[in-house]
Amino acid sequence: PLLRDQGNSAYVRDTGRLHGGMLEWGFYEDKNPRLVDPEDIGNPEKTMGSDSMRYLDLEEVAEPLEKAFETTPILNELGWDEKSSFNGLLSVTPDAGSLIGESPEVRGFWLCEAVWVKDGPGCARLCAESMVLGKTQVDMHAFDIARFYPEQKEKEFVKSRVYENSQTVYTPAVHPREPYISEREKFVSPFYKREKELGGHFDNEVARWERALAYESNRDKLEEYLADIPVRGNEWDRRHVPYELANAEHLAMSDSVGMINLSHFPIMDIEGPDAE
């Protein structure tokens, strides 16, 4: 059995051992998560038993543990077991997704990383399908290890985004289109200033590029096309994306003409047999 305390970013579970079991309490560090560089993961001075288990001081979890005593008083009765307490490493990516597939750098080297317990069976199946069949039953883009552009693998970018994702990895609930705060306005089009003047909606970036989803300057087109635009009644569905405005722009362009900024789209050179 597992008890989650989302407000405290913590959980309690019975490990189910023989002779009465054992309670285990865990906490996800959300306010100021500590990042570990890959080069430091196997540091013998900081690890215990496994490279993913690092030494833990009681002071590091004192505040959330105190709150846990209130919700589950038996923890206070059992006390602190220093020998079996540790800091566990979590694998977090710049977009909080898993990494599944064949390494782009090493042919034949397959990975299934940054996978949480609840996602384990599904991710394992996707990896197996990729290896055996060469394709999967579902779209793999959000998990594909090759989805990141070189600029998204720069160390400072990775650390900034991982730090941001780690703060919301357990609580609170995060909108699927929640905009990132760190590492913004790094890649902009030659028209970015003008797009801002036109009221461009730049809530989300794509592959580090700032891309407008719609423009406030086109709001007058809403009145003309409102009857043809689907209504999204729930605020959650409309959050971070100006759907009505974007739909009006598309309809207006279908009836007339328009200009689309494609400067941030990738240009790829295809080489090899039949590349023409």
Stretches with model-predicted labels:
Residues 27, 43-44:
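Active-site neighborhoods of metal-dependent hydrolases
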Residues 11, 24, 99, 110-111, ...:
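Structured core elements
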Residues 139, 149-276:
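Glycine/proline-enriched, intrinsically flexible loops and inter-domain linkers
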Residues 7, 35-38, 47, 51-175, ...:
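C-terminal catalytic lobe of FAD-dependent flavoproteins
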Residues 7, 16, 29-30, 104, ...:
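A broadly conserved detector of short glycine/acidic/proline-rich loop/turn motifs that flank catalytic sites
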Residues 1-23, 27-34, 56-59:
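Mid-domain catalytic core of redox enzymes
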Residues 1, 44-46:
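Surface-exposed intrinsically disordered loops and tails
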Residues 25, 32-35, 118-120, 220-222:
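A short local loop/turn or secondary-structure capping micro-motif enriched for an aromatic residue
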